[in-house]
Swiss-Prot record:
Domain comment, as recorded: The reactive center loop (RCL) extends out from the body of the protein and directs binding to the target protease. The protease cleaves the serpin at the reactive site within the RCL, establishing a covalent linkage between the carboxyl group of the serpin reactive site and the serine hydroxyl of the protease. The resulting inactive serpin-protease complex is highly stable.
Signal peptide annotation: 1-24
Subcellular location per the Swiss-Prot or TrEMBL entry: Secreted
Record-stated family: Belongs to the serpin family.
SMART domains named in the record: SERPIN
Record-level Gene Ontology MF annotations: serine-type endopeptidase inhibitor activity
Superkingdom, natural source: Eukaryota
Statement: the UniProt record of this protein carries the keyword Protein transport: no
Identification of the protein by name: Alpha-1-antiproteinase
Glycosylation sites: 65, 102, 165, 266
Length: 412
């Protein structure tokens, strides 16, 4: 590799913590949130984000069908779109087309304004839902970034810029990891394991989400249960249980149960439980159009629900994943990042994405809360999430998939 080429690092971190809560009788929609429903900017890019989410999911699923998957399409797409502001030529086109944008159908200004509004909306204070994102730009002291790039990533992507001494890789690593740890409230530590000596800049994106269930589980109803990883493997997990009314339907197209559980605030978790032997069919068949139908047509029924407590982590080298989606130039010696800086040729050395998911019934917010529901006299069906299933965390105002994943083994 020519010594004149310096390296950049793309680091993306996501944390999704699903905690209990209570029914909020006084939850009112603010004027600001009403405006969001009518604001077209982030809605323009929402279908592309959903398409990208499923594209990325399928690439990861093909890499391994025996491991958990968890990632934030919003985090990955935001960082790449921000980086695209400093790219030119094929490098530029590959990134935006890899994010499922058709540049003949959508103006580039609309794309960046869409992300700008998305980030503004997601970061709006909400006392019911903790949701924050951050973009950090770590720049070597010897490197001067182009003024336009710096201005654009600050204005459109709310980026913070930090001066970093990359010649001291341990100190640089500590600075970057500290930024991520603080942004994810201590949940993601040591996001960067190693830094190459040629690294001169790092673009770091994090997303932190902590949601409280509208209808929490009771801790005393959690008991040990079986989770069937595959035909040959069964593991013991803490299985939460609640008898009540849930948004649940059976989809014959997907051969799956579809459960929607709302958070206090403006987000929903969608869990898809395929029939035995139908996981591959579900992965191949699910689309953004089918997902949209579920969100619009909800069916409430009484169910005895069993759901595993879990904490899973997804860590990915995005270089191999993104190359499958056609994003290759930015990682090669042919990369054109001249919009970032003209001082030295740059390429992206690697892209790292780490996301953590925790689902439980705990939390002081749920203490002393009682939710009473009318239950019919006939015995309701049991629905047990005791085999591999998919999860999508969806934010309603922006119509965005915040997180996507697959739980194969809750104990991993």
């Amino acid at each position: 590799m020519p010594s004149s080429i310096s390296w950049g690092l793309l680091l993306l971190a996501g944390l999704c913590c699903l905690a209990p809560g209570s029914l909020a009788g006084d939850a009112q929609e603010t004027d600001a949130s009403k405006d969001d429903h009518e604001h077209p900017a982030c809605h323009k890019i929402a279908p592309n984000l959903a398409e990208f989410a499923f594209d990325l999911y399928r690439v990861l699923a093909r890499q391994s069908n025996t491991t958990n998957i968890f990632f934030s399409p919003v985090s990955v797409a935001t960082a790449l779109a921000a980086l695209s502001l400093g790219t030119k030529g094929d490098t530029h086109t590959q990134i935006l087309e890899g994010l499922d944008f058709n540049l003949t159908e959508m103006a580039e200004t609309d794309i960046h304004q869409g992300f700008q509004h998305l980030l503004q909306t997601l970061n709006r204070p909400n006392n019911q839902l903790q949701l924050t994102t951050g973009n950090g730009l770590f720049i070597d002291q010897s490197l001067k970034l182009a003024d336009k790039f710096l201005e654009d990533v600050k204005n459109l992507y709310h980026s913070e810029a930090f001066s970093t001494n990359f010649t001291d890789s341990e100190e640089a690593k500590k600075q970057i990891n500290g930024y991520v740890e603080k942004g994810t409230q201590g949940k993601i530590v040591d996001a960067v394991k190693t830094l190459d000596k040629n690294t001169v800049f790092a673009l770091v994106n994090y997303i932190f989400f902590k949601g409280k269930w509208e209808k929490p589980f009771e801790v005393e109803h959690t008991t040990e249960g079986d989770f069937h990883v595959d035909q040959a493997t069964t593991v013991k997990v803490p299985m939460m249980n609640r008898l009540g009314r849930f948004d649940l339907l059976y989809c014959t197209t997907l051969a799956s149960w579809v459960l929607q559980m709302d958070y206090l605030g403006n987000a929903t978790a969608i869990f898809l439980l395929p029939d035995e032997g139908k996981l591959q069919h579900l992965e191949d068949t699910i689309t953004k159009e089918i997902l949209s139908k579920f969100l619009k047509n909800r069916h409430t029924r009484t169910v005895n629900l069993y759901f595993p407590k879990l904490s899973i982590t997804g860590t990915y080298d995005l270089r191999s994943v993104l190359s499958t989606l056609g994003i290759t130039k930015v990682f090669s010696n042919e990369a054109d990042l001249s919009g970032v800086t003209e001082e030295a040729p740059l390429k992206l050395s690697k892209g790292v994405h780490k996301a953590v998911l925790t689902i439980d019934e705990r939390g002081t917010e749920a203490a002393g809360v009682t939710v009473l529901e009318a239950i019919p006299m006939s015995l309701p069906p049991d629905v047990r999430f005791d085999r591999p299933f998919l999860i999508i965390i969806y934010e309603h105002y922006t119509k965005s998939p915040l997180f996507v994943g697959k739980v194969v083994n809750p104990t991993q």
